Swiss-Prot record:
Protein name: CASP-like protein 5A2
Bilayer-spanning residue ranges: 39-59, 71-91, 116-136, 156-176
InterPro entries according to UniProt: CASP_dom, CASPL-5
Keywords: Cell membrane, Membrane, Transmembrane, Transmembrane helix
Species per Swiss-Prot/TrEMBL record: Arabidopsis thaliana
Lineage: Eukaryota, Viridiplantae, Streptophyta, Embryophyta, Tracheophyta
Length: 179
């Protein structure tokens, strides 16, 4: 049995009129505020950087922080957090300026993993520093010889930086999991 097959002929779109204005790229519905490439995401990155850098500077300004491992860990973790947040803030500024979405699967994976690692390190360092600060202040009662105010301030700033980093991680992880 010989059956004829329909042939498909491509149909070209008529050329766009020269008077039409090209629409700028728009933000997808998936881009909730707080995600990378949004204004709230940029604000979260800015506050992460600000508080992590402040914690780093306050702790590094004391002369005896290198003698305690937890305080050295806090300096390293907040240094990493501030560099990560600053780099991603610059990426967010670029994405906002050119109106592009940062919802590429690989980018979201990178952001989620990086945010998870840096926020976990910052939280662990803040907890360790808080433990040492409580030991020095309450248990040993030796704040007169130490920089307890700077230690407590730096620890509090590290916790605030973690509070700003946690939503970024959760938004990126949620975006990655919902694909």
């Amino acid at each position: 049995m010989n059956v004829s097959h329909a042939s498909v002929h491509p149909v070209e779109d008529p050329p766009a009129a020269a008077t039409e204005v090209e629409n700028p790229p728009r933000v997808r519905m998936d881009d909730m505020e707080g995600m990378p490439g949004t204004l709230l995401g940029l604000a979260l990155r800015f506050f992460q950087f600000l508080f992590a850098a402040a914690a780093l500077c306050v702790m590094a300004s004391t002369s005896d922080f290198p003698s305690v491992t937890a305080f050295c860990y806090l300096v390293a973790a907040t240094g990493l957090q501030s560099l990560w947040s600053l780099a991603l803030a610059m990426v967010d500024v670029y994405a906002i300026m050119v109106k592009r979405s940062l919802q590429n699967r690989r980018l979201v994976s990178l952001f989620a993993i990086g945010d998870g690692v840096t926020s976990t390190l910052t939280f662990a360092a803040a907890c360790a520093s808080a433990g040492i600060t409580v030991l020095i202040d309450n248990d040993l009662n030796s704040c007169a010889q130490n920089h307890c105010v700077q230690f407590e301030t730096s620890t509090a700033l590290a916790f605030i930086s973690w509070f700003a980093a946690l939503p970024s991680f959760l938004f990126n992880f949620w975006s990655l999991a919902s694909r």
